[in-house]
């Protein structure tokens, strides 16, 4: 029997080149002839009208070949399409006003970066400063400064979604609780920042090399902005991207800006973002103010919830926002059975930098609130937090489960996953330890969080931002889908190559694909070469292509498996022809096609490759020459949003159960993690070691947002956290000493391998579980954590205020 590779911790093939400095990142890209360099002039004002430019000194500077201003942008490009009907014109640089500190207002192109930076300081921009507003609640007040006069409001979008009968649920409730939450604006600070090389050819073709991660719907949107046909704009993504975590989705405005600079300068233009630029003006998750209500019975049964959100998207709303509000529509109810829900979602523009996907996109916000309310309800009813959740969990026999908001939970055993987590954590023992600690005056707390982990976003969810009347118009084009492709081919010597349309940023696609193909074709992973460089001129791709939303683990691997199976079927047909046997009488086994019964020749993949390539006459009649197969996989459950605002916003849904124990220092308010257990149900695990790495990384991202990270501004909109001295990112020193990881496997019936996504994982649970643990630790003071991050300073002041009262 051939060795099975799926489910094994095969070492990552990517690591050797990365650890030995042989990676090919955007800044390592083979030199493009006569490349010049760009420096971006950015607004120093949070809100100001642009009165004019003087670029004469910059143009006269040594080595400068072009200066592009907002006037050029307004004349030669179109604004980007946005996901709402509010008239917001978002260009790749400021045209009429600057609306946040760091917004691009001009670009200088010079012989090298040093000369470009020097010349950028010579660009003079005349401003009329205007009042700024950074708080989303204040931005909606009648006398607030309006960022976009054509819109006449700072409210970029608003939807009220009603599922079931929430009014009835609250009327019949025996207990109603209300709470206000605040979630911070933070990013994921990938080790590699944005990078672009653009070359505008004389024939009108623009080639762009960049570390863009997708989705490739941004390709046609960018082509439209630049006035190009789609087949005149070529995106190439290098083999290696130094992390992204959603942030590099938002590089596309800079692609348009640097492409325009190349067109003006008549030379290829390269721009590599520095760290201050990245913190100042790349992208981040939204900060949110939320008001939550829960209706329940005294036995703990949750009847319904109400959500009210104000999501702060910064100076403009840009695609894929307002995904911050609607990406988790299908899993709004989390892992719980309640059927009645009201969502009041407002998207607000303020004088902060712009937002977009950040690891766990919108789910960290969602579960911080929901799991906080579940703990409050347990406290109110005198129930253990685990017991309250158990009474409301979906049961295994309910799967596949259709949520009231339209989600289609494909598989799961939530109680078993919870049981495994509390068993590993020795939950009862922790409670006994807590009782002893409290008796000794220590602040010891235990937190629990249960979340549904959505993966593979359905492109149709974004239309939830539009009201049903707008979507019902004849000219409206419904949107749906989640598609990926793969090609597998065998060369004349029998070596196998897999060609992907993905854009990995460290997830280990080459390793995982080699494992899958090896299993399907009876080979070893060493026999398989994987090519994962994206090129829109040569790859099979769709608007949903890319590596984001934890999609590769299900849609990407499914395309690979199906392509390998198509190729295997062709090998079987060919070998049966050579054996002069019916196809039903042969089988593919142990890397070769063999007779099912009796004696006869067998043909290995290498044998068949040699014959097929060198002697096409040997092929059966009607068989196409060549040994290759392409598969395009999409989900049948990926539908457009319906007239009742229901949508299956993702395509596979995992589950995570976490337990954390912490101690809060009575003198410094420092938080020490004593135990952290995380149990995941992500369907079939293809490579446990890679899965563990994703869970560790996700946990640290969540920890950053919970305890340290926030992009902060003063009241005038000036940016306060422009370096890693001010913007605190957790390091190995701040990481938990141990993360205990386990799995429950409920294979997805929707994917060929039974796999689901895993990449965002604990980034969406940690803010909830650690906030609940700290709240539990500080319960003797009557404190509950409702705002993040819990920096030592903010927590210390919170504790001192509580002690005074």
Give each language-model segment a name.
Residues 70-71, 227-234, 262-269, 324-455, ...:
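C-terminal catalytic domains of large/alpha subunits in multi-subunit enzymes
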Residues 111, 267-313, 557-587, 591-592:
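Phosphate/diphosphate-binding loops
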Residues 77-82, 119-122, 189, 210, ...:
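Short acidic, glycine/serine/threonine-rich loops at helix termini
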Residues 1-155, 176, 254:
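Flexible, low-hydrophobicity surface segments
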Residues 8, 14-17, 83-84, 153-196, ...:
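Glycine-rich loop/linker segments at domain edges
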């Amino acid at each position: 029997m051939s060795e099975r590779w799926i489910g094994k911790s095969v070492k990552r093939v990517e690591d050797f080149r990365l650890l030995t400095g042989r990676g090919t990142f955007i800044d390592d890209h083979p030199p493009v002839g006569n490349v010049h360099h760009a420096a971006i002039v950015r607004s120093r004002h949070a809100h100001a009208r642009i009165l004019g430019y003087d670029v004469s000194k910059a143009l006269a500077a040594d080595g400068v070949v072009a200066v592009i201003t907002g006037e050029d942008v307004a004349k030669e490009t179109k604004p980007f399409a946005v996901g709402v009907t509010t008239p917001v014109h978002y260009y790749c640089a400021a045209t009429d006003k600057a609306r946040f500190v760091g917004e691009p207002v001009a670009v200088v192109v010079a012989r090298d970066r040093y000369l470009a930076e020097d010349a950028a300081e010579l660009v003079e921009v005349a401003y009329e400063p205007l009042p700024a507003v950074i708080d989303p609640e204040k931005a909606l007040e009648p006398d607030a400064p309006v960022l976009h006069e054509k819109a006449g409001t700072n409210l970029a979008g608003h939807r009220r979604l009603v599922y079931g009968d929430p009014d009835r649920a609250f009327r019949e409730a025996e207990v109603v609780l209300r709470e206000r939450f605040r979630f911070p604006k933070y990013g994921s600070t990938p080790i590699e920042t944005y990078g672009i090389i653009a070359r505008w050819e004389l024939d009108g073709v623009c080639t762009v090399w960049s570390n863009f991660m997708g989705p490739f719907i941004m390709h046609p949107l960018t082509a439209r902005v630049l006035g190009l046909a789609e087949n005149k704009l070529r995106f190439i993504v290098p083999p290696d991207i130094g992390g992204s975590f959603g942030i590099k989705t938002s590089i596309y405005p800079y692609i348009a800006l640097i492409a325009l600079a190349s067109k003006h300068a008549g030379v290829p233009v390269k721009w590599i973002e520095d760290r201050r630029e990245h913190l100042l003006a790349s992208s981040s998750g939204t900060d949110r103010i939320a008001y939550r209500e829960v209706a329940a019975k005294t036995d703990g049964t949750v009847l319904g919830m109400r959500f009210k959100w104000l999501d702060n998207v910064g100076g403009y709303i840009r695609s894929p926002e307002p995904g911050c509000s609607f990406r988790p529509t299908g899993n709004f109810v989390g892992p719980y059975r309640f059927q009645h829900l009201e969502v009041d979602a407002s998207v607000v523009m303020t004088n902060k930098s712009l937002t977009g996907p950040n690891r766990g996109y919108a789910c960290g916000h969602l579960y911080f609130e929901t799991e906080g309310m579940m703990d409050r309800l347990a406290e109110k009813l005198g129930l253990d937090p685990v017991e309250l959740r158990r009474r409301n969990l979906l049961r295994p026999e309910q799967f596949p489960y259709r949520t009231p908001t339209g989600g289609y939970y494909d598989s799961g055993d939530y109680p078993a996953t919870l049981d495994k987590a509390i068993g590993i954590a020795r939950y009862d023992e922790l409670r006994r330890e807590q009782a002893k600690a409290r008796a000794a005056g220590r602040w010891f707390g235990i937190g629990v969080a249960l979340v549904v982990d959505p993966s593979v976003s359905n492109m149709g969810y974004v239309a939830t931002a539009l009201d049903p009347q707008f979507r019902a118009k004849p000219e409206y084009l419904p949107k749906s889908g989640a598609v990926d492709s793969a090609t597998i081919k065998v060369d004349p010597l029998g070596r196998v190559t897999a060609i992907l349309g993905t854009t990995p940023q460290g997830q280990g696609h080459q390793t995982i694909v080699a494992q899958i193909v090896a299993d399907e074709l009876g080979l070893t992973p060493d026999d398989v070469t994987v090519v994962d460089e994206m090129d829109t001129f040569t790859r099979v791709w769709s608007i949903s292509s890319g590596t984001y939303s934890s999609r590769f683990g299900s849609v990407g691997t499914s395309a690979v498996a199906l392509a390998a199976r198509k190729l295997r079927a062709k090998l079987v047909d060919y070998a049966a022809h050579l054996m002069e046997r019916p196809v039903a009488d042969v089988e593919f086994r142990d890397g070769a096609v063999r007779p099912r019964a009796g004696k006869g020749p067998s043909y290995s993949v290498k044998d068949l490759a040699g014959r097929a390539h060198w002697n096409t006459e040997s092929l059966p009649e009607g068989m196409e020459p060549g040994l290759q197969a392409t598969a395009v996989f999409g989900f049948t459950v990926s539908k457009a949003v319906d007239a009742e605002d229901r949508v299956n916003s993702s395509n596979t849904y995992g589950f995570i159960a976490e337990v954390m124990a912490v101690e809060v220092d009575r003198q410094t308010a420092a938080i020490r993690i004593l135990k952290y257990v995380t149990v995941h149900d992500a369907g079939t695990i293809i490579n446990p070691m890679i899965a563990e790495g994703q869970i560790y990384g996700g946990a640290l991202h969540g920890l950053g947002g919970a305890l340290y990270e926030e992009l902060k501004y003063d009241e005038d909109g000036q940016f306060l956290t422009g370096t890693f001295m001010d913007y605190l990112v957790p390091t190995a020193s701040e990481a938990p000493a141990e993360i205990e990881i386990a799995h429950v496997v409920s294979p997805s019936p929707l994917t060929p391998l039974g796999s689901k996504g895993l990449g965002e994982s604990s980034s969406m649970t940690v803010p909830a579980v650690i906030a609940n643990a700290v709240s539990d630790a500080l319960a003797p003071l009557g404190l509950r954590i409702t705002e993040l991050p819990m920096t030592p300073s903010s927590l210390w002041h919170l504790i001192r205020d509580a002690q005074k009262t």
